């Protein structure tokens, strides 16, 4: 659905339109709830015993991942479900066609979702290509130290919040250290192979789930 320069690609985005029309004076019954309000995610009082699993397919160049990753980790912790983080390559690095219009929509949609959720989303420095590969090459090592999620979170913040050039040694160093890892150790491992097959397995699992 398109209205006055803004796309609404699903029912879950119509609250943006309702709020926009309300700000323009179109809401004549302000006491009446929105027809399609934003769905808040709450953990509730009942905790799982680990029998349920939350799978997170995380891409280091995805705006959506950047605003959802930390919240997904927190949700798993709060609810007691088992968290399974499954990193994947960005769409354009695995051959998924993406028009400029689609890219613009994704970035603008993420921005309005971030504002609604009060999630940081400010300066973007594109990590496409080598920065993503270099970070993923460190991921198995970070996981062995119990810092895999911290590494991904740190990279996403650098790329989508702080505007860090992760293509430089200085940028990657800040990512590593902000994740609580030792840069001198990381320098010896950057660029190593051994991570690609796991990401390919994750890609296939994601496609099998009907996701892209």
Which residues fall in each region the model found?
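Conserved aromatic-histidine-acidic binding/catalytic patches
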Residues: 5, 49, 60, 98, ...
């Amino acid at each position: 659905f398109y209205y006055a320069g803004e796309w609404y690609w699903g029912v879950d985005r119509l609250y943006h339109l309702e709020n926009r029309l309300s700000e323009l004076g179109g809401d004549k019954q302000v006491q009446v709830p929105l027809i399609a309000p934003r769905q808040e995610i709450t953990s509730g009082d009942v905790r799982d015993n680990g029998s349920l699993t939350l799978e997170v397919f995380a891409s280091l160049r995805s705006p959506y991942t950047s605003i959802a990753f930390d919240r997904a980790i927190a949700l798993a912790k709060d609810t007691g479900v088992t968290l399974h983080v499954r990193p994947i390559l960005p769409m354009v690095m695995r051959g998924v066609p993406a028009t400029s219009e689609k890219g613009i929509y994704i970035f603008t949609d993420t921005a309005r979702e971030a504002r609604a959720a009060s999630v940081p989303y400010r300066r973007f420095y594109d990590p496409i290509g080598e920065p993503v590969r270099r970070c993923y090459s460190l991921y198995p090592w970070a996981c062995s130290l119990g810092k895999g999620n911290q590494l991904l979170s740190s990279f996403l913040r650098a790329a989508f919040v702080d505007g860090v050039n992760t293509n430089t040694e200085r940028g990657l160093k800040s990512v590593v250290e902000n994740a609580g890892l030792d840069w001198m150790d990381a320098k010896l491992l950057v660029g190593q192979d051994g991570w690609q097959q796991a990401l390919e397995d994750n890609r296939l699992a994601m496609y099998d789930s009907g996701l892209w």
